[in-house]
Amino acid sequence: MLGSGFKAERLRVNLRLVINRLKLLEKKKTELAQKARKEIADYLAAGKDERARIRVEHIIREDYLVEAMEILELYCDLLLARFGLIQSMKELDSGLAESVSTLIWAAPRLQSEVAELKIVADQLCAKYSKEYGKLCRTNQIGTVNDRLMHKLSVEAPPKILVERYLIEIAKNYNVPYEPDSVVMAEAPVGVETDLIDVGFTDDVKKGGPGRGGGGGFTAPVGAPDGTMPMPMPMPMPMPSPSPNAPFAYPLPKGPSDFSGLPVGTYQAFPNIHPPQIPATPPSYESVDDINADKNVSSAQIVGPKPEAPAKPPSRPVDNYNTFVLPELPSVPDTLPTASAGASTSASEDIDFDDLSRRFEELKKKT
């Protein structure tokens, strides 16, 4: 049933905040675990094996927690991708049941690390009822992720896992370490050596499809144990011909001829000898005879000769050598003298009295 306190936008915002907070915590805890490995190597070098084992348990706890955070980050991302189903449907979609129940179950266990996770769980409980939230917190509904529950459990890590952590740390830092022979002898057969479980299903572990083998046999999914691969078909042997028998083409495969006549075989060709090369080389014509024949054949051709292409008009050639210049007068050496009747000044030619008289006459007429 639809809860009254559900707010879709608040759920969306807090889902994004949870993803960002989880990414930061994963990075921080991974860096701290790398530094702690150096301290464990120092303990092993100093001979403090028991102290190193206790520190390894802390590292395993942190690695478990980082893996659990990665699972929660994946579920938050899934809810954001399918947020339309949460808004539109009143009932819980079957594809979101594991994500919703796992987030509600993990909220009280990680709310000290991620405070926004509690808000997400409260909004989901308001959406799908408080009774559903109680069932998820106790896992009575049975949809909480088992792998996440194992990573966040309070049980101590296996002793064989602690020893293998110590072996790998000593190998990386070149520190001599002798593992506990009692613990190594009690290790069950087939225990995984790595901490992070990649989550293989039973079908893959029992012989599912290979991972990029490149040419090997791929067993079908869900095949029973002990299934033997089907052998590859072998090519049929070809009959070897006898060295003395003549070559013959094989009979054509397919329906028989419509005429009903038997199909014959091609027989080998009889022994045909190549022609003999003559003892004396053949005579050839000389070069002079060939040239004479060409001249005769060209003389026998009768007909109008093809006209030559018209040449473009050529530009007239200027003959600068035959050009005659006219005879010019010589340059005078002295300045010309003024004539006797010419006036030397322009002011002497103007009669001002005559001009004033004529001006007065004009004034009187007007």
Swiss-Prot record:
Region named Disordered: 297-354
Compartments (UniProt record): Cytoplasmic vesicle; Cytoplasm, Cytoskeleton, Microtubule organizing center, Centrosome; Midbody; Nucleus envelope
Organism: Rattus norvegicus (Rat)
Family, similarity comment: Belongs to the IST1 family.
Pfam families per UniProt: Ist1
Gene Ontology CC, one term: midbody
Name recorded for this polypeptide: IST1 homolog
InterPro entries found in the cross-reference section: Ist1, IST1-like
Pro residues bias: start-end ranges: 306-315
Gene Ontology molecular function: MIT domain binding; protein domain specific binding; protein-containing complex binding
